[in-house]
Amino acid sequence: MADVYELFLTCPKGLESLLLEEAQGLGLSEARAQVSAVRGQGSLEVAYRLCLWSRLANRVLLVLARFPVENAESMYLAVHAVNWEDHLDAGGTLAVEFSGKGSGIDNTHFGALKVKDAIVDNLRERSGRRPSVDKVNPDVRVHLHLDRGQATLSLDLSGHSLHQRGYRLQQGAAPLKENLAAAVLIRAGWPKIAAEGGALADPMCGVGTFLVEAALMAADIAPNLRRERWGFSNWLGHVPALWRKLHEEAQQRAAAGLARAPLWIRGYEADPRLIQPARNNIERAGVADWVKIYQGELATFEPRPDKGQAGLVICNPPYGERLGDEASLLYLYQNLGERLRQSCIGWSAGVFTGAPELGKRMGIRSHKQYAFWNGALACKLLMIQVEPRQFVTGERGERNDDGQARAPSEPARLSEGGQMFANRLQKNLRQLGKWARRDKVECYRLYDADMPEYALAVDIYGDWVHVQEYAAPKSVDPAKAQARLFDALAAIPQALGVAQERVVVKRRERQAGKKQYERQSSEGKFLEVGEGGVRLLVNLTDYLDTGLFLDHRPMRLRIQKEAAGKRFLNLFCYTATATVHAARGGARSTTSVDLSKTYLDWARRNLSLNGFSDRQRLVHSDVMEWLREDDGQYELIFIDPPTFSNSKRMEGVFDVQRDQVELLDLAMARLAPGGVLYFSNNFRKFELDESVQARYAVEEITGETLDPDFARNPKIHRAWRITVR
């Protein structure tokens, strides 16, 4: 009778029940699952089968001993007591992995050293020779796990993790491990669908991991058939004849599977850079006759199997990690739902996602959800039957003349809150649109938290929409805030009739110091817009602000009207949009000062766009320092400082409330006789110092500097006209 060993199989969190079923099918007896593992009993043949055929395990460990550990010395003695001559040649190589802690062993490196020392000392005492350490490809890899004073000492039969099948030498930005992909396919019912001759399509296939794993299952190919080196290859307990028998059996099954008519398995990928790596992976896996990959956008996804058979749509859409990804992800899921409803009636779909709340935006009900972990990220597999009765849209599916189901043409139905938000946008558009068309305003604020539960600012930039989400108070449930954001983002394209890809979203929080200048993205896309006869460059993606403060539109137009023949000074000039207006208005010269080189470069482009350059001076400096040294005279000065600012180039921090008196005194000293200084800022609690009002002729003109799009929010800024008494 063959020896029976205790076997311990590790796996990613969430795969335990699937691995338990798989391991039992491969012969593991007395099996039971625990967190990220399955343990049971089996012969060496069972252990070999698990190594060769498990699609889900990370490692197959053969348990050598279990023992209590009181301290490092007792652990050393227990490991030393094992007869290591049965497992490792004294002149061979060894690697030790240690996990867990306790019993005075709180450092895994120290624990591994003690285990290694015990093995080396054992072999040296018996043979006079000692093994050397090879952490990459050892003859034997030993693992010791310590948990609550109990140690489990094992041999790693698998060697490198079993998810490394050997075919995926090229991968994309966010790949799924092969065993996780296999688990998702099993949960999605692919083995049954494949057995019935069904098809499989992945509309966002990346480098093809789902496709290869699906083909390996369908063709009855052992996932690790092509692996050449195993953890047991140089283990002294290895039985080569038994292994050869099992390996030849697996080769025969693979040959028989590949000899069958291939199933229809197709992948589509928008990124052309991933197409060849994916095809290379498929070729290495030996399933090139079964799997085909094409370049294609999600918008054109329409699987058409050769025999018209239905099957499984499987995909792992991207999930966002930076601010602003919400909109693109929302619309991606909406598009995925639309393609399923339009082109995949009668199919099953499995959407594996790290953002399951976005699954609700597909417009199709998920009848089953499975929890997984992709590393440390909690994920879900959303299972969907693509049938009209499952659609959550503005209409139910209809029937064609031949009785076949026809997908609804409408987008996913808005939630009740989303519809209310859409109605408000359309109401505002009717009111503000008339004003914007009459005054030829291309860029304006359409919505500014009009409904408190939808705390957004929605700005129109020509045929683009720029959305800023105001950060919710800590008292607001983040999940509810995100759900409302998704409601709003779903409503915007429908309400405004804009393409989804022309909606850009950011999160607005209080910006201080360097953060106000930090990039949010690096797309570098500039959009040209018009205002009052000038052309200006805005960037909707890369920075928190777009390069154009919409609330200052009336101030810029005022400057344009008053600038003729005057020397114009623009302090804290940002992208110098006011300077462009002054130059257009006929200013004799302009000087613009800002601490940000990025925005001064932007300012230079704005001026060049309008044909101005020679007389326009751009100064890279701290405004306060520059004012202390400048001796020029200016008939028109505009100051719109940030609330706070700091930089390595500054001494200290600029605070508009604290530093206003010095700032205005320095600037007024530069004001030419008969000149005017306009001062504005956006600090809602700002109060103009009484000493300023006592020394100069001060007139608050805030009301005159607000157009209809900001009339609902009179605290957006305050503005004053200041002259010498």
Curated annotation (Swiss-Prot):
Region of interest: Disordered: 393-412
PROSITE patterns in UniProt: THUMP
Annotated family: Belongs to the methyltransferase superfamily. RlmKL family.
HAMAP family linked: 23SrRNA_methyltr_KL
Catalytic reaction equation(s): guanosine(2445) in 23S rRNA + S-adenosyl-L-methionine = N(2)-methylguanosine(2445) in 23S rRNA + S-adenosyl-L-homocysteine + H(+); guanosine(2069) in 23S rRNA + S-adenosyl-L-methionine = N(2)-methylguanosine(2069) in 23S rRNA + S-adenosyl-L-homocysteine + H(+)
Described purpose of this protein according to its UniProt entry: Specifically methylates the guanine in position 2445 (m2G2445) and the guanine in position 2069 (m7G2069) of 23S rRNA.
Primary location: cytoplasm
Molecular function (Gene Ontology), one example: rRNA (guanine-N7-)-methyltransferase activity
UniProt xrefs under InterPro entries: 23SrRNA_methyltr_KL, DNA_methylase_N6_adenine_CS, RlmKL-like_Mtase, RlmL_1st, SAM-dep_methyl-trfase, SAM-dependent_MTases_sf, THUMP_dom
N-terminal signal peptide: none
Location of the THUMP domain: 46-157
Species lineage: Bacteria, Pseudomonadati, Pseudomonadota, Gammaproteobacteria, Pseudomonadales
Top EC class for this record: transferase
NCBIfam families to which the protein is assigned, alphabetical: PRK11783.1
EC number: 2.1.1.173, 2.1.1.264
Stored SMART domains: THUMP (SM00981)
GO CC field: cytoplasm
Provenance organism: Pseudomonas paraeruginosa (strain DSM 24068 / PA7)
Protein name per UniProt: Ribosomal RNA large subunit methyltransferase K/L
Highest taxon in the source lineage: Bacteria
Cell compartments where the protein resides: Cytoplasm
Keywords: Cytoplasm, Methyltransferase, RNA-binding, rRNA processing, S-adenosyl-L-methionine, Transferase
PANTHER family, sorted: RIBOSOMAL RNA LARGE SUBUNIT METHYLTRANSFERASE K/L, RIBOSOMAL RNA LARGE SUBUNIT METHYLTRANSFERASE K_L
